[in-house]
Amino acid sequence: MQSVIITGADRGLGLSLCREFLGRGWLVFAGKYLDDYSLLEDEAGKNPNLHILPLDVGSAASIADAAGILAKTTESLDMLISNAALMGPVNCSLYSPPMDLEAVWRSFTVNALGPMRLVESFLPLLDRGGMRRLCFVSSEVSCIELMKHRGDSPFPYPMSKASLNMGVRLLHNKLFPENYSFRLFHPGWMKRRMPDGSLSETALYDPDFIGAIAARYFENPLRDEQRLVMVDYNGYEWPF
């Protein structure tokens, strides 16, 4: 049975990805951070192949603890999906002084440094997996060239997601020669899932709709695995 660890799995895209991979017969390890959400526990009660791990991607100690638990549970991992993210305050920019640089740092810790820590900590298990696939959820706001007309954007999320893309590029340089394959995905503007399972009215897409697309992209082989590209929910490539 193939296995995957998914971060930020409490709700939204992460939860939808858990459901998708469970439906495809995978063993799923789900990183849980939000105590006020019990949607993962509801899923675990229906499927014994879902295992919940306490996991704060912004904490090196939490990642190390999760890796230790996983090493006692499974001998290998086939796929890692780095989905957890922190948006940061929307008014954090030079347009709304004083700028909260601590908020910028918190977003960097989760969105850019967290995925690098995840790969480093879970690499021994991934080395023993058959697929060796690393998947990262990024964003259109990570594209530096495309942000030139969006001067009022808050700083934390775009800056940290652009940094994530660079980190993925450096990981690709090192790990592609070791038979690792990579996926970088822009999911679009998704509705927020509430603790009771309902969806917010704002945003465009149901996370279950995007989750099905993302799961196919993450699981299936590409024609050219050597190229590192960022792909959106329509299959279009984005510059980064």
Role assignments for model-derived ranges:
Residues 44-61:
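Rossmann-fold cofactor-recognition segment
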Residues 86-90, 94-108, 116-117, 127-176:
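Catalytic loop of short-chain dehydrogenase/reductase
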Residues 177, 184-187, 192, 196-240:
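C-terminal helical subdomain
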Residues 24-40:
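Conserved glycine-rich Rossmann-like NAD(P)H-binding loop of the short-chain dehydrogenase/reductase
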Residues 58-73:
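Conserved Rossmann-fold cofactor-binding substructure of NAD(P)-dependent oxidoreductases
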Residues 10-20:
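N-terminal Rossmann NAD(P)H-binding glycine-rich loop of SDR-like oxidoreductase domains
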Residues 6-7, 82-83, 133-139, 181-186:
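Structural signature of the Rossmann-like NAD(P)-dependent dehydrogenase/reductase core
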